[in-house]
Structure formats: structure tokens, C-alpha cells
């Protein structure tokens, strides 16, 4: 069993923002597999998919970004999912829009959702997919990440969401290091 957490903020006003690209990836997986979202007792929405016989629990924390770990850790404990079977999907300002990077460990890199998860799981050594949203040319980062993708960037971000979902489906049957090597080369 795997736990796939897409990071974002709950609520309609955040739905299409850069900061919610993690939610968009797990929504894509739920859509592909036609599985419903249900409110969990761990302050998140969950959906279960089966890929190649492997159950994957998709989760969208409802804690708001900065407290994502408060949802992830209890789900790991409840389902008895080891850290190596967890993937966190989140937005990354340091990658161009539409690029993805898979990693098995690393710092939070200034991302508050990742800081919360690292604090709650007590390690930086877990799988992650960083989805590029680029940096603003000028202005505040907060307003930028809470803004929607402009029309010109939508084809690139849709492709990144698809590619991230493909990588997660591959992870159902393939060690993450191999998935990482495959998708980081593209």
C-alpha cells in the first residue's frame, strides 16, 4: 500500500492556484481511476485507487498548506504505511512551469507544507515530486503562488500534472529510484 499526498489549500478560491498543483495531480489520478473523494477522520480528503494490484491512498490535506503534516502522519500510522511508500507532490518555485523533479530526500527548500511534513514524520528522507511553477518576475511570492496559472502556461502545467500522475502510477509496480531515473531524464 502506498500513500500519495498532493499538497494544496482547501476551498474553491484556491482550486486552480499554483500552490494547489499537488491537489491537481491527485485529482488527476482519482479522475483516471473514477474513484470518489471521501472526508477522512484525519483532516483530509482521501480516495483509493488500485494500480497493477497495488492499493494507493490519495490524500488532499484539509489543514491548509502550512499544517500538512498534521494530516499525513496520522494517515501513515493508521494504514501502517512506511515512509518509503509515501510520495508528496507539491509546487516548486525553483523549477520552470511544467517541469517535474522526483527526489527521495531533501530539505523543505522554503516550502511551508514540506516543513510541516518533515516536522511530523521526523525525517527528510521520503519520496517527493516537485512540480515547477516558476518564480514571479516581480512582486511577492505569496500573491504569486496563490494566483491562478495564466492561459499561456496552462498547456505546460497540464502536461506536468499528467506526467506526475504517470510517475505515480509507475511507482505502484516499480521502485521509486527507477521511476525517478526515468522521469528526471525527460
From Swiss-Prot:
Gene Ontology CC annotations of this record: cytoplasm
Name of protein: Peptidyl-tRNA hydrolase
Residues the record marks as active site: 19 (proton acceptor)
Record keyword Membrane present: no
GO molecular function, one term: peptidyl-tRNA hydrolase activity
Enzyme Commission identifier(s): 3.1.1.29
Keyword Nucleus: no
Record localization: Cytoplasm
Gene3D superfamilies, per the entry: Peptidyl-tRNA hydrolase
Annotated source species: Listeria monocytogenes serovar 1/2a (strain ATCC BAA-679 / EGD-e)
Subunit record text: Monomer.
Residues holding tRNA: 14, 64, 66, 112
Catalytic activity: an N-acyl-L-alpha-aminoacyl-tRNA + H2O = an N-acyl-L-amino acid + a tRNA + H(+)
Amino acid at each position: 500500500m502506498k500513500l500519495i499526498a498532493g499538497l494544496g489549500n482547501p476551498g474553491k478560491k484556491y482550486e486552480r492556484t499554483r500552490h494547489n498543483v499537488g491537489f491537481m495531480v491527485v485529482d488527476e489520478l482519482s479522475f483516471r481511476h473514477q474513484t470518489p473523494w471521501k472526508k477522512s477522520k484525519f483532516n483530509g480528503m482521501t480516495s483509493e485507487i488500485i494500480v497493477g494490484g497495488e492499493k494507493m491512498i490519495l490524500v488532499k490535506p484539509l489543514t491548509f498548506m502550512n499544517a500538512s503534516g498534521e494530516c499525513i502522519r496520522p494517515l501513515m500510522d493508521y494504514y501502517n504505511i512506511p515512509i518509503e511508500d509515501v510520495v508528496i507532490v507539491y509546487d516548486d518555485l525553483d523549477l520552470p512551469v511544467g517541469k517535474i523533479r522526483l527526489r527521495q530526500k531533501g530539505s523543505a527548500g522554503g516550502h511551508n507544507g514540506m516543513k510541516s511534513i518533515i516536522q511530523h514524520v521526523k525525517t527528510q528522507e521520503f519520496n517527493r515530486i516537485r512540480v515547477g511553477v516558476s518564480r514571479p518576475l516581480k512582486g511577492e511570492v505569496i500573491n504569486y503562488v496563490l494566483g491562478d496559472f495564466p492561459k499561456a502556461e496552462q498547456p505546460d502545467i497540464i502536461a506536468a500534472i499528467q506526467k506526475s500522475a504517470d510517475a505515480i502510477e509507475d511507482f505502484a509496480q516499480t521502485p521509486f529510484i527507477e521511476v525517478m531515473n526515468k522521469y528526471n531524464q525527460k
